[in-house]
Amino acid sequence: MRHLPNLICLFRLALIWPVAATLAAGQYALSLGLFVLAAVSDGLDGYLAKRFNWTSELGKFLDPMADKFLLMTLFVESAWLGLVPWWITAAAVARDVMIGLGALVFRLWFGPLHGRPAVISKINTAAQLLYLAGVMFSAAVGFPPREVLDAFALVTFVTIVLSGYHYLATFTRRVWSTPAQPSS
């Protein structure tokens, strides 16, 4: 049972292709259902890992990667299909690339990067998930109207920028306060 959160996370990774394929095929209701299943699995694996202390190094890596792959895939595809604006897609992808590269550089130069996701990062992930679910719901049933989605896109954009800024500031502080490790 200890590895159940990792299995759920792998299940979420496996759902990315069917969500993307059904979205591309215009099967918006099915795509939304699969996407909601993926989003619920994100909450479930985190809950189980914390509640039963089933955390692992693999899970600490796999969970955020699954989130990033799911969200980046769907943002890019949704923009390509004309369902979301490119500007929010560019912001979401740029934020995730910046965080990924920042973490990689920190690890290579300074060693392991310890810490927990910031509250603003969790809010951002929730906003992105809700925004994309709203976009798919709108594509499936014609509601909510475009103006509501545009307003939520702005709210989501603000969380992307605030979260990106928070990570940039955090990485910068850690870089200045951590001595570089000698190269081997």
For the regions a language model picked out, list residue spans one by one:
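Alpha-helical transmembrane bundles and membrane-interface segments of multipass inner-membrane proteins
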Residues: 1-184
